């Protein structure tokens, strides 16, 4: 797992209070990890702060899984 993926995983665990073994690449924030719409907004804000990237609203709407977040951040930092 990349450094970015590890950091994303830690943010998700801290914000949603879920078990680490549930935070896998294909895990949906809402369907698998129990997030609501406010949680997803807070996660996006936490990703922006942690990684120093801006995630526009249209991009944020397409970040539905842990893997989506990692891919977006990797691309934004490239």
Curated annotation (Swiss-Prot):
Assigned protein family: Belongs to the acyl carrier protein (ACP) family.
Coiled-coil stretches noted in the UniProt entry, renumbered to this chain: none
Domain of life: Bacteria
Positions of the Carrier domain: 2-77
A GO-annotated cellular component: membrane
Pfam families, sorted: PP-binding
Swiss-Prot/TrEMBL keywords: Cytoplasm, Fatty acid biosynthesis, Fatty acid metabolism, Lipid biosynthesis, Lipid metabolism, Phosphopantetheine, Phosphoprotein
Entries under PANTHER family matching the protein: ACYL CARRIER PROTEIN, CARRIER DOMAIN-CONTAINING PROTEIN
Disulfide bridge partners, by residue number: none
Single GO term (MF): acyl binding
Known role: Carrier of the growing fatty acid chain in fatty acid biosynthesis.
Biochemical pathway: Lipid metabolism; fatty acid biosynthesis
NCBIfam families the UniProt entry points to: acyl_carrier (TIGR00517), PRK00982.1-2 (NF002148), PRK00982.1-3 (NF002149), PRK00982.1-4 (NF002150), PRK00982.1-5 (NF002151)
Coiled coil among keywords: no
Main location: cytoplasm
Name recorded for this polypeptide: Acyl carrier protein AcpP
PTM per Swiss-Prot/TrEMBL: 4'-phosphopantetheine is transferred from CoA to a specific serine of apo-ACP by AcpS. This modification is essential for activity because fatty acids are bound in thioester linkage to the sulfhydryl of the prosthetic group.
Protein's cellular compartments: Cytoplasm
Modified residues (O-(pantetheine 4'-phosphoryl)serine): 37
Gene Ontology terms: biological process: lipid A biosynthetic process
Matching InterPro entries: ACP (IPR003231), ACP-like_sf (IPR036736), PKS_PP-bd (IPR020806), PP-bd_ACP (IPR009081), Ppantetheine_attach_site (IPR006162)
């Amino acid at each position: 797992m990349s450094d970015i993926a590890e950091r994303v995983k830690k943010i998700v665990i801290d914000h949603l209070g879920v078990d680490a073994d549930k935070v896998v690449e294909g895990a949906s924030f809402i369907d698998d990890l129990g997030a609501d719409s406010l949680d997803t907004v807070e996660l996006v804000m936490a990703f922006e702060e942690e990684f120093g990237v801006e995630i526009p609203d249209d991009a944020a709407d397409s970040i539905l899984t842990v893997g989506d977040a990692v891919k977006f951040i990797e691309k934004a930092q490239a």
